[in-house]
Amino acid sequence: MVRILRKIKSAAVNPLKSSQPLGAAFAFLGVEGAMPLFHGSQGCTSFALVLFVRHFKEAIPLQTTAMDEVATILGGADHLEEAILNLKTRTKPKLIGVCTTALVETRGEDCASDIANVKLKHVEELAGTEVVLANTPDFDGAIEEGWAKAVAAMIEGITRSGERTRQPKKIAILPGCNLTVADVEHLRDMVESFGLKPVILPDVSGSLDGTVPDRWVTTTYGGTSVEEIRELGTAAQCIVIGEHMRHPAKTLHGLTGVPYAVFQSLTGLKAVDRFVSLLSAVSGAAVPDRVRRHRAQLEDALLDGHFHFGGKKIAIAAEPDQLYQLATFFTGMGCDIAAAVTTTDMSKILQKVPAEWVQIGDLGDLEALAAGADLLVTHSHGRQASRRLEIPLMRVGFPIFDRLGSQHKLTILYRGTRDLIFDVANIFQANQHAPTPEALDPFRKREMPDELRSSPLTRH
């Protein structure tokens, strides 16, 4: 059984985690015509906005209620109402996703009642715009919890409840926040290859894929439509990727009765085989030849790459589901997990991480535990530890701001697992130190007796 080591420091040294409000805003960004709204001070929003822009290299729609000292004391209901009405007038969003911050949560504001009053008071002004609330205090949880709460809030607030007529080819997919833009796009292609029609919530592949719109857009310009969220109850099956998305799936099941299947990871041959089998069973179709070819390519990559992985020591710092995804990938390739650090102990998936223990902590803990490892695996803030320890760094997760194209890398299904094998094997090869001639032949520099040095044989 994995031991979960609690955080004992009173401060964070080179923080690992991102906050719940950021995770909720991230999920809202996967909806078409959405505008995430932080209910808090301007600084909270500015910090999250900087992280998003540095990671995606895109213009990110994100607004704030701009709570000041007076609102903090007297209450922020007026600021929230003013912000919602201003956003409706100026940007005309289809969805306003309100994310609470530590400021209003600590004060104990009843944001749900405040939003209900705003909706009741301004029925005509807010026509055509959904307003959804995600309670996401910064002091609790991390990006995974914020993402999951936002998705659950959208389902609760928008999806029509009750048993609906099922569309046999329609599949609802709830991806975790650890999937990249390329992962979500590849996931859709895989599902569509079986003749199924996926509805992905949230769909960041449509809104954060780097597409430049032909006109200025004040909200998100792609992603899942509000109408698709409203009709999720007509799906024949819900597929969940990541343990943190189990709660939104339960919410959908409770509202509409849609059955769900949870895949805690889609990286690795066995996990993907199970996923493909489910798609084949739901669709009633045989596995397409293209998918079979991708599987054969992965098998070849496993043969080519396993020489470079065996016995390597890996130190990973990531969110719980991504930690599980990567740790199972590396151990499946013959590596040992030398250090496993994560952000929060709220996820049950930590009990399945293939390591002796998991430390709840930060990148300072990773640096202290990673001595002797062959590879560090974390986001861009791990680069200082990599430099000091002289251990190569594989960048994963959020944020990645010192490399381009991180969102266009595949990490799931057959092709993503294949690409991971090649990427990691190439890192190992680029950083291995070739033995010197002296190391291979210890007698090369041996001392010679004086009589042999002066011998005619040595001169010729």
Swiss-Prot record:
GO terms for biological process: nitrogen fixation; protein-containing complex assembly. GO terms for molecular function: metal ion binding; nitrogenase activity. Keywords: Metal-binding, Nitrogen fixation. CDD domains: Nitrogenase_NifN_1. Pathway: Cofactor biosynthesis; Fe-Mo cofactor biosynthesis. It comes from the Bacteria. InterPro entries: ChlB/BchB/BchZ, Nase/OxRdtase_comp1, Nase_comp1_CS, Nase_Mo-Fe_CF. Disulfide bonds: none annotated. Residues 441-453 have a biased composition (Basic and acidic residues). [7Fe-Mo-9S-C-homocitryl] cluster binds at C44. Residues 436-460 are annotated as: Disordered. Belongs to the NifD/NifK/NifE/NifN family. This protein may play a role in the biosynthesis of the prosthetic group of nitrogenase (FeMo cofactor). This is Nitrogenase iron-molybdenum cofactor biosynthesis protein NifN. It comes from Mesorhizobium japonicum (strain LMG 29417 / CECT 9101 / MAFF 303099). The lineage of its organism: Bacteria, Pseudomonadati, Pseudomonadota, Alphaproteobacteria, Hyphomicrobiales. The gene is nifN.
